[in-house]
């Protein structure tokens, strides 16, 4: 019986190591191979090979499909900027801390459950109209410049320090949900009347110019050094 169990365990181990990550986009696949992650030189990426990667940059390749990226489950840093992506699902990359996905054509972005994400760059995608960052509780830096967001919920982002959201269609935002924020660039949005920045004691830089604000209440912004409105 013991020998049978050992055989079964060994067979399962071999199967796991032999499983191949399906990567339909040839440019995506070839870059991963060119970076040296195909350790057994079979022109495929095994699950075990993908799981050994912690940092991956696939920028400037005209990639259109990122299917297979969720097989790289130990990634902490991912760069897919300057491609032709229309969708990006990285929801299985639970260890991800840095995501650089700017200058694509992304419309559908799934970053659900990335509770370790600290830096998110999705600027210049044009088609992003909604962005759910409410569960990204350790996020420190957020850049969504040059998209089409009309609203953004910052609930729970208690360590967020930097927001870049210039050239969107934001009509409202509650910056007080991000009490540690230091730098805010929300130039050229559609804000009206005012934005509540009261009590943001760490705020040092604020740009909300290009909107139709009537007034700002600077109460409590004791470290504010530079502002434009």
Task: Identify the residue ranges that each predicted region occupies.
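Bacterial Sec-dependent N-terminal signal peptides
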Residues: 1-20
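N-terminal capping/linker segments that flank leucine-rich repeat
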Residues: 14-79, 94, 115, 137, ...
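Conserved hydrophobic position(s) of the canonical leucine-rich repeat
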Residues: 53, 75, 85, 96, ...
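Conserved hydrophobic beta-strand positions in leucine-rich repeat
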Residues: 54-58, 78-80, 97-101, 118-122, ...
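Consensus "Asn ladder" position of solenoid repeat domains
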Residues: 61, 83, 104, 125-126, ...
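Canonical leucine-rich repeat
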Residues: 64-69, 88, 109, 130-131, ...
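Right-handed parallel beta-helix
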Residues: 69, 77-85, 91-105, 113, ...
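Eukaryotic tandem repeat interaction scaffolds
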Residues: 183-190, 198, 204-210, 214, ...
């Amino acid at each position: 019986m013991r020998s049978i169990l050992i055989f079964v365990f060994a067979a399962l181990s071999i199967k796991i190591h032999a499983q191949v990550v399906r990567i339909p986009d040839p440019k995506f696949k070839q870059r991963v191979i060119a970076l040296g992650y195909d350790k057994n030189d079979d022109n495929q990426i095994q699950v075990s090979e993908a799981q050994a990667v912690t940092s991956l940059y696939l920028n400037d390749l005209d990639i259109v499909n990122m299917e297979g990226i969720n097989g790289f489950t130990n990634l902490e840093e991912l760069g897919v900027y300057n491609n032709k992506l229309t969708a990006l699902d990285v929801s299985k990359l639970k260890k991800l801390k840095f995501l650089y996905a700017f200058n694509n054509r992304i419309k559908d972005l799934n970053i659900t459950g990335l509770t370790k994400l600290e830096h998110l760059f999705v600027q210049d995608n044009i088609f992003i109209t909604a962005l759910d960052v409410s569960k990204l509780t350790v996020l420190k830096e957020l850049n969504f410049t040059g998209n089409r967001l009309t609203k953004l919920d910052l609930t729970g982002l208690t360590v967020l320090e930097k927001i870049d959201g210039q050239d969107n269609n934001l009509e409202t935002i509650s910056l007080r949900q991000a009490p540690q924020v230091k730098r805010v660039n929300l130039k050229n949005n559609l804000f009206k009347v005012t934005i509540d920045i009261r009590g943001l004691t760490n705020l040092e830089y604020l740009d909300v110019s290009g909107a139709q604000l009537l007034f700002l209440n600077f109460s409590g912004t004791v470290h504010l050094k530079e502002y434009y409105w």
